[in-house]
Amino acid sequence: MNDQLQYDYIVEKLASAGQVFEICSKIKDFEQLAQVIEKDLAALDPKEFPSMWKESEIIGEIKFDLAGTEECFPIMIGDFTANIFAVCQRCLDLMEIKVQVKPKVALMELGQSMDNFDEFEIWELSESTLKPHEVIEELLIMALPLSVMHNDKGKCKASLAYLNNEKKQDLVRPFANLRSQLKKNK
């Protein structure tokens, strides 16, 4: 893990220096993220549990800068990706997802406001310092899908089983003749 991500930095100094941090870490370096992933993987049969899931890489960068013309304020932009093991909520099988985060964050002091910068998400900071490691971890946790499912239904055992069953049996439609029955009764 990059040790430089662990240090406390003054936000204004990061922004005025245009500081860039390269991210080349692993899931195991982010304790809270690892806990969230581990809870999801707990649904798997112990035989299917991936042994090296904590070794999945997180790669990218974040950059601090100043935005605004009259009253400058610190911003953080970036692009980083994590490959994460998860459990499909349809078929309960192991799958790997790619979580890409492209933050555009304005780092404001509590109560501070800004106008005409709608492209930035506002984060109010209670302190003038931050640890890039914590910011990256929080962004990754927020980017995790609430319900993980195979994008390709052809890879999902539950979808395949449903499609196969649907082809094999005629669906019973209990209300198919209801309209004609109602007309007869009138």
Question: Whereabouts are the PLM-identified features?
Answer:
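Structured interface patches
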Residues: 1-186
